[in-house]
Every structure is written in structure tokens, then in C-alpha cells.
Amino acid sequence: MTGRLVQYGRHRQRRSYARISEVLELPNLIEIQTSSYQWFLDEGLREMFKEISPIEDFSGNLSLEFIDYSLGEPKYSVEEAKERDVTYAAPLRVKVRLINKETGEVKEQDVFMGDFPLMTETGTFIINGAERVIVSQLVRSPSVYYSDKVDKNGKRGYSATVIPNRGAWLEYETDAKDVVYVRIDRTRKLPVTVLLRALGFSSDQEIIDLLGDNEYLRNTLEKDNTDSTEKALIEIYERLRPGEPPTLENAKSLLASRFFDPKRYDLASVGRYKINKKLHIKNRLFNQRLAETIADPETGEIIAEAGTMIDRRTLNRLLPYLEKGAGLQTYRPTEGVADGQISVQTVKIYAPNDPDNEKVINIIGNGFIAEDVKHITPADIIASISYFFNLLHGVGDTDDIDHLGNRRLRSVGELLQNQFRIGLSRMERVVRERMSIQDANTITPQQLINIRPVIAAIKEFFGSSQLSQFMDQTNPLAELTHKRRLSALGPGGLTRERAGFEVRDVHYSHYGRMCPIETPEGPNIGLINSLSTYAKVNKFGFIETPYRRVDPETGKVTDQIDYLTADEEDNYVVAQANVPLAEDGTFLEENVIARFRGENIVVKRDRVDYMDVSPKQVVSAATACIPFLENDDSNRALMGANMQRQAVPLLQPEAPIVGTGMEYVSAKDSGAAIICKHRGIVERVEAKEIWVRRLIEVDGKEVKGDLDKYRLLKFVRSNQGTCYNQRPIVKKGDIVEKGEILADGPSMDKGELALGRNVLVAFMTWDGYNYEDAIIMSERLVKEDVYTSIHIEEYEAESRDTKLGPEEITRDIPNVGEDALKNLDERGIVRIGAEVKDGDLLVGKVTPKGMTELTAEERLLHAIFGEKAREVRDTSLRVPHGGGGIVLDVKVFNREDGDELPPGVNQLVRVYIVQKRKISEGDKMAGRHGNKGVISRILPEEDMPFLPDGTPIDIMLNPLGVPSRMNIGQVFELHLGMAAKKLGLHIASPVFDGATEEDVWNILEEAGMARDAKTVLYDGRTGEPFDNRVSVGIMYMIKLAHMVDDKLHARSTGPYSLVTQQPLGGKAQFGGQRFGEMEVWALEAYGAAYTLQEILTVKSDDVVGRVKTYEAIVKGENIPEPGVPESFKVLIKELQSLGMDVTILTSDEQEINMENFDDDDDHAPDAIMVDVKPVESEEADEEKNAVTKE
């Protein structure tokens, strides 16, 4: 027997086929959310206040400083916030100090700065009662990027861009004549020497001394028609501010504020880090030949002679002296923008393609700029220009912008910080204005500060940002994946239309950082990704992945873990996780297959620097739940990973017999389960709560401590309308550890993720009913509620104040019989537990109608009988089509009881209806390998094929679905599942390290099955055996959220679009089926003239005709002639609006007046009791030829 037993949680053992021992535990999978938000609360907010503090007025007399801040206690708990439709938030208070410099008076105050949304323990936010997730965004990192391009004559040119976090872009480029240009903030290009002159290097000679003599610089100087700093500054000013009269002062201050003012230009710490890394001299000398002798600046001792080739060893010897300042040159330009001195570090080298040592190149580094200088400096600009000239001579590298070293993540904390910054800067403007207006002696900080812009900015971000998304809560895996999603879209990111193939493609630097498999199909493919299982995000926002270090001295693979970014990984040779190791950790084989910069290479074992931590570090959490992933084609694996997120939680979940070992971790970290916070003993277990008494160690003995109470959620509606239910899995008296699962959430079984059920599957056809991926199913699965799921829908009715008086929620509804009111209580609200069908009343509500003047008799009758029918109309809430079920809960909110309601609303009633949906024909099901299909037939058990022992099959799949799709993993799963079921085992077969073909054969033998795992099957109808033996086994099948009950829809008459008068489309609008252009052609082709006329007129937009037709059908008369379609009138009006004189003539050229056709229109909609809806403009722009019929 291969495989060993592994314990997952308290309740489940699996036989694991993993061969690779994992050194590193999986991290907490939602850490990307929680740690980022924690950083924001601890440091992000403080940074923001520090950035704008102090705010001074224009005279510099008053100064407002932000000293400290604190978050109070949230007003409502998470559950209350969901129930009351409010935001889960805590009040933010800031300590502010106002200093009056004239009088020396200091006022301190605590100012309330709005409620700040808090993150729940599971990494979500509750905004207006709805759970939302902030998705992390992948953006280009601020830095300097160099790229090459080949023009149409085959000449290679270069371009470079300095991209800040915010501020003006600086771009360099060459043209066909070898002149180097610069663009400042996307304006017209200037020769690059103009920018250098503006910095203070005024003469040609100074520029040549600075950058070194070369033909590109000479060409550029020839093209440059300025000859002094003054002219250069004015030239730049004219480009940036065309049409304004240039003065030297203005020009200087403009350039200085564009680039050297930290408020206007911000690289962020990551930009400074990347620029220092790219432009520092040490990274640019590697593998070059020195053209000068480098000496110790302090002692004059020679370290490297001219002509030395700088290899790794020489560079390491040079480093300390370069750090001390060898080759440091200081310039003190006077007239330029740059005040004070500019320090750059210069080393001369020979051009790489010049054996005669004639060409000497200056390499200029940006000196030593501290990490906290967030704006660009003159030294950076000079060094970036120098790098550009070096590139032209073949020194240096261009950048790959799709490399993950050049893309970084903006997680919740940073996105919030940016939003907060916007709010604070708006507030700062208001504070300045108020300082200058109000009396300086009597003013208080509270009066100065207007918190509205800050609150608005935060609200806008959570409410309407593209990155703030309604949480996908279909099942725990969907929740988890949503929190780990990486999106390249959103503000400051890409757009779907502009993104090319390169951005969407899998890149070698994604290894261990972003999943190559899990991404949506469709227009967003490759733009939305998922974080790999072991990946972490570092302080700069770059994704890191863990590797085991190989000790260079002994050649042993150690258990020391280093997290590397994509940039760092490029310097090392990394071996795969499945390389055979000896007991002591050395490589068994002399040659090892490894990766280096995206290439797979074979190297000697002593050249390996690192080794992968685990085979599943490549993929995301959802992909790691697919067993035998290694045997599936990647396209199908993508569908498998995506469809697991659409699995509906079942009534009786069951963990997969063949799993991967990820099920436990995914379920635990998703936030759907209840996790124990402290070690303790279970004192009480109920359906709604679990009590755990803490056990604390005192003097080596365990003593009972505080009591923790855990509330369980019962039958709550999730965001997607599935049922969110938690069940305890511990017993009274159990001793539980911290981090243990106390209660299963939806789609969980004994602490493991359980999205579907293990069913008996045969690969065979049956009367053609499983043609094209259709699925045939046994009735047993319906009878025994195997695939039954619970769905909860929420309906609400509100009574508002109208102009004619308040609406009223009541049982007294006009023209409604007593039998329709049988389920309503005395308030007019449906009772809990009632069974309701389509169209039944849920909440009785009446709205006042406009009063007509009553006669005296009517007034008398009215006074005597209190007849109400006259002045109100029925606007009750009824069950919509397909919404029938059992009333689960009713919540009533009243303004009188102090509930917070929107303005104008007096009472709000929410009714929850629960449906129990059994599986039926038309429902979509899938396996975990992208093998999806729709149920075409549910057969009685007695008709299903059966095994020799009489067991009927549960599901029949088409064998033709396997070969062309190349997802062989499902066949492995089938056989392994059958054997495990017979042996009573659960199995873990981790991705890329699971059971092999040999293992499957061995377990089949152990279970006493045939080696090919096929069985004779008997036809349930005749009892005869089928001709061939069939593959039968246990497969894990899930029911997806695409259910036929949600899609079935029919309409007789219903709402119409206002302009075209055609029926609306779609189930939500109770619309008709579109009879489009091509369908019209089909009828034309068959010459079906009357059908065609009927479809284009009375079934669509002939307003009068459809009313008359309706009346005729009701009265049983003959159907009248159709009239003129509304779209024809619209067309005429459109032509007339273009200024054309369009008239309609009869056959004998008599003019027809269209106005005559409109006589009957006014009462038309009322006649058939149909509401006419205004509709979005798209609806009106439809092709006139195509109509929507009912």
C-alpha cells in the first residue's frame, strides 16, 4: 500500500499520496486583506495626517496641526449592521492643535471626522447592510522604464519613461536622425539638452563634460537652438503653458513645482526604491570594462585598474568604496532650477562593442538619495538621461513591463489611503479659506474643519469604486477567491478594450505569485487573476513567493525559507519541488532541472541556489482543489476552477472522497466556518450558539477562565440568495484548541469544503439522451434530496409619504376577496410559515389616489359607510413569478420605533421566502475538471443500468466528452473514487504530487477490482447485459448556480418601452422574446405573409391594433386588421427631425395624415391594464427592422 494517513482537523483522516514533504504551512489565505487594512489603521492614516499637517493660512499667522487620531467603538455589531442596512463603522476622532503665531495662543480640540468603515474578521466590509470586498489592483509600479522599438527602416530606437505615483511624466526618445528628445508631461518633444540646460548646465561644454562625448549628444546639441539656461527655461515654459507670456521667474517656479515639489510630484516609497535600484551605479557596472582606475577616496589606494573586467567578485570588492563615494562629483549650477548642489557618481567604461578601447562611456549613477525623498531630484534626471545614452551604446537593459517586478499590488489599505488623501486635500482647501475669512482670535479648530469632503470621498470609494465589489457568497470557495482576487482594471489601471495580448498572457514571473489557470473566460481573461497559495505581498506591494534556501557551502537544501520578489528571483537558479533529495537534504542526481529567468535549464547541482517549497505554490486556492490537475488540459482546468465557485450549497453536503488536502484549509480560511479563538472546553452546544470556557495555564496547571460565546447563523440569505447556515461539529465536554473549527458553514462537511456529492457515474450513452455533454440522472437523486438546495429571496415593501397623503400598510385592500387575505395578519403582513404561490399577497398596501369632487349624496354615503375604495389604489407587494415558497421571516422597521429609514419612508417590511429546489431537467451540473453539462433526462431508478450486485447507476455521462477535451483527470478520479469507496477511505491527491497511474492500479487491486476498473452493466429496462464493459466509478459532481427555475420565463402581455412601444426584453422586466432581423428573414423566406404582418404589428408595437386584438380574443370575435406600427411613426419623426419633408401617400397618391392614427392611443394601455415603462436609450436605438414579440 502506498500513501500514508493524514489527519485534517479533528474529524477527518485521508490517505495522502503526496511524496514531497512540505516544509512550510500554508499561510492564512485572507491575510492579503486583513494585514493591508491593519497597516492602514496603524500607519496609513498617520502618514496622511502628517502629509497635510500643518495647514497654514496665506499670511502664515494661523497654523493647524493634526497630532493624533483614535477609532472609537462601532455603533452596531456586524449582525446588527446587516439587519438594519447600515454601514459597520467606527467613529474617527482626531486631536487637532490650532496655533495663533501673533498671540502665541494654542487651542487643542478633539474633532470628529466621520464614521470609518471597519473590516470584519473575515476580510469584508459591510456597507449599507451589504457585504462587500475590496479587490486588490495590479498596476505598473512607479519607476523609470526603458524600451526598444524597431522603426519601419529596421533601425532600432529606444524610448524611456519616468512614471511617478502622481505627477508629470518625463519621456525620452530617439528619432531616425539619432537625436535624443524629451517630452515633459505629454507635450511636444524638445531636445534633451534643453532640460539639462534648464537644470543649470548652461553651455555645450558643461553638458559634454557631464555626460561624456558621443555622437548622439553632438547630434542633439546641434538640434538644440537654445544656448543658455535662461532660453532653455523659457522654451520649456512655452511648451507647458502655450499662449502665456513667459518670464524667467515663472519658468523657474513652474519647472520646480512640476518635479521638485513633494506635494505635486510623488514617487511613493516604491518608486524611490525602484529608481535607486535601476539608476544606482553598482547595478550598471556588472560585466563592463573599466576605462579609469578606481581608488579609495580616503586613502588613494588603487582598487581596480583601468581595463579590468568587472565580474561578480570585483564588483563585491568595489561596492564598499562605491558606497563611500568613489567617483562622486558635485556640481553647483547657479542659474538653473536646481538650487544648491547636485551630486552624481560617475565611472568611465569602454563601450562593449569596441575592442580598440577608443569609445569611452560615462556611467552616471544618481548618487545617494535617501529612501524618504519621495519626489524626483536633478540627480535622478541626469542619471536617467545617462542610462538612456548608455543604452544607445549597448550598456544596460530594457525593461519588460509585464514582468511582476514591474507590476505591484495596491491592496485595501493603499486604495483607502489614496481616497482619504483626496478627501483631506479637499478639506485642506476649505480650512485655508475659512482661516482667512474668520476672526483669528475667536476661531476654534472645530469651526475650521469641514469633514464633509472626507466622508464623501470614503463613501464614494466604498459605494461606487470599480474595485469595491458586492461579495460573491455563493459558497465558501467563492468568498475566499473573491478576497484573493487581483484585478488589472479599475481607476489608474487598464481598460478591457485597450489591454493587448501581452498583458493578459501568462508570464514566467507569475510562477508562485499569480495562478496561471484561474481567470475568467471572456473579455476579462488575463486581466483578473488570483493570488497563488503561498504568495505574500511585501511592503512595496510586490508579490513574493517562498523558496527553500540551498546552503552554498554544503549543497544541502535547508529548511530556511526566503521570500523572493520576481526581481530577486531573476538572479538565482531555482530547482523544482519534485527534485529527488537524499535523507540529509542533498540533491541525489548530479544534474538538476531548474529554472533561470524563465528558461528551463539543466545545471550541475552545486549551481542551484533555491528550491520550490511545494508543488502547489504555482496555483491558486481554487485550482489547488482539483485532484489530478496534472492530467487535465489547462483550458478545462480553468473552467473547473471557475465552476467550483458557482457550486450551490446543498442540503446535505458531503466532502469529496477524492480530494487534494486543500479542502480543510480553504474552508477554514474562507470565513464561513466558526473558528475557536482560545483553547478551552466546550460547555454547551446548541443550534444557535456554542459556549467555550477558556483554559488558561497558571503555574503549570490549567485553570478555567472566561466564557466565550459563539453565535451561529441559521438560514440566513447570502448575497447570492443561497442559504447560509452553520452547524456545530463539536460535542459538550470536548477540549478544543485555538484555531479549530467549531461549526461548519454552508458547503462544509466535518470542517472540509464540500461543494457537491460523491455519486456513482458510468461513462456510457443511453438512447442518445446524453448527446453534446447532456447528463442523464437517476430519480434516486431527486427522491433522496441528494442535490436539493435551499434558496432564500428577500422582498421589501415600504410605505412612503406621497403628495396626496401617506401610503398605508393594511389588511383592508379594495377589490380583494377574503381568501386572498387568508395568510395576512391584522397588520396586513403575511404570517411566518405560510406557504405562498406566485401572485399571492405578502404585504397589503394602499396608496391614496387623487380626490375628485364628491356630490352631496356620495359624501353622505362616505360618512356613513366609511367607504374607502374610492380614493385609494392597491399597491400591495405580491409574490413574483417563480418566487413561491414558505415565508421564513418577516422584519418590520418603523420610524416611530426609532429605526433609521430613508427620508420619506414611514415603514419598511422585509419578507424572506425560502424555496427548496430539487434537481430537475435543465439544471447545470459539473465535475471538477471542467466537465459541465445540462440534465436532459431524469430516469426512474428501475430503468437505470445496474451493476452485477444490483446497484443502479446515479449518473450517465457521455464518453465522447473526454478525448477531445483532454481532461483525463476525471477518469483517474472515477477509478480511484470507486476503489476508495469500497475500502471505506477518503483520499488526498495533491496537485502535481498526487497518485500516479501505478498508485491507482495498486489501490484497485487492494479493493479487489479489475485492473482496467471496468464492469459489466445490465440494462435496467430489459435486464440484458450491455455488449461492452463500462467504466463505472465514484465522481464528485456539483450543482451549479445556473438553475432552470431562475431562467424559465413566459409572457402574455406586459410592460412596453415608452418610445418604440415594443415589449421590453429580459426576465427581470417580464419582457418578451426578441424576434430579430434574422428571424424576420426566415419568415420572409417562407413567404409567411400573415404571420410576418402579425409579428411586426399586433404582437409588437401597433398600439391600437394590439388593444383591439386583445379585445377580439377576449370576446371571441375575428381579429381586426392591423394598424401602423409605432416604430414606423418614430422613423418618420426621426426623418422629419433631420429637416426632411416626409409624407405618406395612399396608392392613388392621396396624403395620409398620421395624426388620425393617434386618436385611440390615449386610452390604449389602460384598456388592457398594461403599464408602459420608460426605458434606457439603448432600447430606443434598436434596429427598426427587428421587433420584440410577446
UniProtKB/Swiss-Prot annotation:
Matching CDD domains: RNA_pol_B_RPB2 (cd00653)
Function field: DNA-dependent RNA polymerase catalyzes the transcription of DNA into RNA using the four ribonucleoside triphosphates as substrates.
InterPro entries xref list: DNA-dir_RNA_pol_bsu_ext_1_sf, DNA-dir_RNA_pol_bsu_external_1, DNA-dir_RNA_pol_su2, DNA-dir_RNAP_su2_dom, DNA-dir_RNAP_su2_hyb_sf, RNA_pol_bsu_bac, RNA_pol_bsu_CS, RNA_pol_bsu_protrusion
Swiss-Prot/TrEMBL keywords: DNA-directed RNA polymerase, Nucleotidyltransferase, Transcription, Transferase
Family recorded in the similarity comment: Belongs to the RNA polymerase beta chain family.
Any one of the GO CC terms: DNA-directed RNA polymerase complex
Xref: HAMAP family: RNApol_bact_RpoB
Keyword Transferase: yes
GO biological process, one term: DNA-templated transcription
Superkingdom of origin: Bacteria
Pfam families xref list: RNA_pol_Rpb2_1, RNA_pol_Rpb2_2, RNA_pol_Rpb2_3, RNA_pol_Rpb2_45, RNA_pol_Rpb2_6, RNA_pol_Rpb2_7
Protein name: DNA-directed RNA polymerase subunit beta
